Amino acid sequence: MTERRRLVILGVIASVAFGARLGARLARGEADFWEQSYGFYFDLAQKLVAERDFCLDALRCAYWTPLYPAFLALATGGARCFEAVAVAQSLVGAGTTLCAYGLARRWFDARAGLVAAALTALYPYFVAHDTALQETGLYTLAVAAATLALDSVPTARRPARAALLAGGLTGLAMLTRPSLLPFAPLALGWLWLGRRGAPASERWKALSGYAGALCVVLMPWLLRNAAVVGRLTLTTRIGHSLWAGNNPQTFSHYPQGSIDRSAEAAWEALTPAEVAEVGQAIARGETALDDWFRARAWAYVREHPGRTLAAAGRKLGAAFWWRLNPAKGRREQLVYGSGYVPAMLLALGGAWRLARRRQWSPLALCGAHVVAFGLVTAAFWAHTSHRSYLDVYFIALAGGALTSLRRRE
């Protein structure tokens, strides 16, 4: 197949990805879009357009990272137009399809890339979820693009430039969802080991390029938060999220239901003295409230180490299980399982193919993502939407497995 024909096919696949996502969203209608959404993101976007401000209220000035609200503001201009969001996020989903192609092509070959792109274009969870009013679709694209750039560093003609691009894209992903933070040190280790044949000076250039670009992208937001809330931090949400995942009520609703319902149950179980402490923390400001929740979570972990360890396993199981978390209706579950289960099984075949060829670098890169996500999930919690960005790498591996099966036939 010629390169030109391959690009035409890839363009068709990306167009199908865009059309499938947009069509699915329009079919469900505007009412469903606003009802099944995280409305605070759009509130932030409107505030950004109207006031050039990311403070939703006095206690949420650094609670959410800025990239997705900024994306919504750019897409809608602050107008309550769900079609504009649907179009913009369908384009994001098409971009993820192109990244899946790039990864599978690098790890296997161009045929595997086209298969991975087609699978991503029609992957049921992505088709249904990429246009939801939440950051998942944008985060999936940002991480996939960063991973593709990172994977290119060892073979790039100018690895330092490729590392700069990878670091910058990783920073953008963290400004979309800060839970990617544990991946950064793993990526640095991968870069060092992935260029073992290169001179030490070249390896240090790649590492410094990645880390430097990451810091440059993150620093404006960090400095803004230092000025606004008095702390150099990506988010003041860590404490509450840690507490939601580490208290006696964590599994009162989660994972069958939303972690928000478990957090509500935990809040209702607070003693009057604890409620008074929360009031005092609120009076001191956003970071003090974050610190209070963080301290309560660590106190629970210290008092119940065995229970915490068992809970970590349960959280990981819920995140990677074939059932949606939180649970949905039977039809939604069947549609989700029809994509996720085959992708996971075929990914094992793709990983085996790489291992037989001693291509350890892609496996290590995928493993770094899984480990980083696993650490965050074990310490905090995760719904299916938080894990779904990993499915791009499982699908890329699945593309390699499917092309291998075809060759055997």
What is each PLM-predicted segment?
Residues 37-48, 58-80, 90-91, 137, ...:
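Short hydrophobic/aromatic helix or loop-helix immediately within or flanking a transmembrane segment
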Residues 1, 110, 146-165, 191-198, ...:
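Membrane-interface transmembrane helices that cradle and orient dolichyl/undecaprenyl
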Residues 233-314:
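Membrane-proximal stem/loop segments at transmembrane-domain junctions that anchor or position
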Residues 99-102, 119, 138-155, 162-166, ...:
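Specific aromatic-rich, kink-prone transmembrane helix
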Residues 84-108, 145, 345-349:
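Transmembrane-helix motifs of polytopic, lipid-linked glycan transferases
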Residues 11, 62, 66-70, 78-98, ...:
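Loop-to-helix entry region of an early transmembrane alpha helix in multi-pass inner-membrane enzymes
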Residues 14-20, 113-124, 128, 140, ...:
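Short helix- or helix-capping micro-motifs
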Residues 80, 84, 282, 289-293, ...:
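Membrane-interface anchor segments at the N-terminal boundary of transmembrane helices
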